[in-house]
Swiss-Prot record:
Marked site (Transition state stabilizer) residue numbers: H23
Residue sites binding substrate per the record: T15, K47, L79, R93
Species of the source: Vibrio parahaemolyticus serotype O3:K6 (strain RIMD 2210633)
UniProt keyword annotation of Isomerase present: no
Name under which the protein is recorded: Phosphopantetheine adenylyltransferase
Amino acid sequence: MNRSVHPMKVIYPGTFDPVTNGHLNLIERTHEMFDEVVIGVAASPSKNTMFTLEERVALMEEVVAHLPGVTVKGFSGLLVDFARQEQAKVLIRGLRTTVDFEYEFGLTNMYRKLLPGIESVFLTPEEEFAFLSSTIVREVAIHGGSIEQFVPAAVANAIEKKVNERQ
């Protein structure tokens, strides 16, 4: 954990459907920089998710259990409202490509309009995770491919179970 002069709570938001090793890498790196990390698992009702919000929260809790100072909370509605509720002034966002940057840049400006003083910190993935996304993992799993190298073991097991239920 960070030993900064001022304690700081940050939020790393996402749908995490499913959480990948890339997400976990960003969480671990964020954990090294900030005192308190809240993983905000978004309900995302407009997305056709593989896992329910409750399942995604439970999987994330299992995956980050080894990290003191990291908590997991589900939320619905606007991210800025969740940040306000959590009294967090910093959002952590992962950037894989310039397309991600353009999208996140637009969101950041909107966040600042809705919650003045909110800041976004952008982290790029380590090279081995640069291509990785939840969408890719779901597609590989649905088509019978091996996902063990892309997600934590508990997540791979949960995905396998979910895919088998749908068949």
